[in-house]
Amino acid sequence: MAKVIHGKGIARLRKEMESIKNARLEVGFFDTAVYPSGVPVAYVASIHEFGWGPIPARPFMRPAMNAQRATWQRNFLSGFKAVANGQVTTKQVLDQMGMKISAQIKESISSVTSPALQESTVDARLRKLTAGVAATAKGSIAKPLVATGQMLNSVDYKVTA
């Protein structure tokens, strides 16, 4: 049997349903994330995702999306049902999903192992390491995508609700 909502409950429900309509969750690399050289992390991430010239594609975003899409859809659906039932707010659902999705993208970045780095890239990393520049946030010096950890640590989310 359907539950009838009266008074303040209906006003709250209308407000939350309106906020769902206007809500937005963005996950990825934002303008504030830049390398010390000033190069946007999003630019470097897109080169790694799709490849460019001599740099082979090392996709991490699309594999994460493909692997998690059904789970994300189920989680959004159950979250918005909880909003409709008055258990949580739209912003809470989107914040929770943003944290989860950004963590899964970071995991995807960390799991990339191929194509292997060129020997010249590994040599350049070793030179930087011996010159005192921070290198290797996770894994070995020869692991793709995680030399400094900047890209990995720049995955973030924004909620507009």
Across the structure, where does each feature detected by a protein language model lie?
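Short, Lys/Arg-rich flexible segments
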Residues: 1-161
